[in-house]
Amino acid sequence: MEFLVAQILSGVSLGGQYALIAIGYTMVYGILRLINFAHGDVFMCAGLMMVFMCASLPVYVSIPLMLVLTVLLGFAIERAAYKPLRSAPRMSVMISAIGVSYLLQNVALYATGGQPQTYPSLPFVSGTVTILGASTHWVTVITPVLVIVLVLLLQWLINHTKIGMAMRAVAKDFETSQLMGIKINKVISVTFIIGSFLAAVGSLLYFTNYPTVIPTSGAMPGLKAFVAAVFGGIGSIPGAVIGAFIIGICETLIKGTSMTVFSDAFTFALLIVILVVKPTGLFGEKATDKV
């Protein structure tokens, strides 16, 4: 029983970390109809920034600095790689996103010399706590609480602020929003900023559990977060969060059995099933092309 509780708690924690990445995917897709393949690498860069900054700065200085730099990185990627292609075919933008992904990985490879980097210990999340007889780390408890708080704040921003209203309008009809005078570039930049911030927070929690950072550290979490977004209905924030929690729990339960080698395969098998059975996901809306 204690083992099952520990696995479920770990799954909820992992799912919360995937959720913070998945929200970035689903928000960008909702606005631009773009799969930002570089998003997982922004997550990885946030982890590397913490490694390098904690080598010479206190943790309480490194964390806010890392959050700011990650946000600036996301903003810079949008301005340099996506904004010039705003009117280009979607394939061109997707290729640009893949190019940015490999660029970030190669910059990380150069910065680390190809050596795995040990993530610094964060004292406020690395302690242990006992829940229902199962011993687990504080990060396991903090993650779902933090995710819920951040999602509620994000939902408030989207539903009760001027920029949120603009984001909903652009997501509903990009061209009409432009004609109505909505500042499209500002809306898109804010979307990338929010997504990058949440990915940075996710990196703090994720690398506390998996404290080794390499240039490809963002690849698998990024892909799984993307699957979570598709599962929940890409473009739906609640859907992305629920999908991420389901994937995180299922993954850790599989890892607790003799079938642990298939824990990653399950996620991608789920993606195939979703695309065949319900392409719009759990909460997604069927899109219609305007003529």
Predicted segments with their positions:
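Membrane-interfacial amphipathic/re-entrant helices at transmembrane-helix boundaries
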Residues: M1-L20, M49, V59-V61, A88-I95, ...
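Membrane-embedded helix boundary and interhelical linker motif in transport proteins
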Residues: L9, I31-A76, A80, T257
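Helix-loop-helix "hairpin" substructures at the membrane interface of multi-pass membrane proteins
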Residues: L14-G15, A134-V213, I237-I242
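Short, non-helical or kinked segments that cap or interrupt transmembrane helices
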Residues: G16, Y25-G47, S87-S92, I163-A166, ...
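Transmembrane alpha-helical segments in multi-pass inner-membrane proteins
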Residues: Y18-L20, L57-V68, F192-A199, Y206-A269
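Hydrophobic core segments of alpha-helical transmembrane domains in multi-pass membrane transport
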Residues: G47-F52, L67-L73, V100-A108, P144-Q155, ...
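Alpha-helical transmembrane segments within multi-pass membrane transporters and channels
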Residues: P58-V100, V107, I242-I247, K278-P279
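Transmembrane helix-bundle core of multi-pass membrane transporters
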Residues: P84-H160, V187, L253, S258, ...
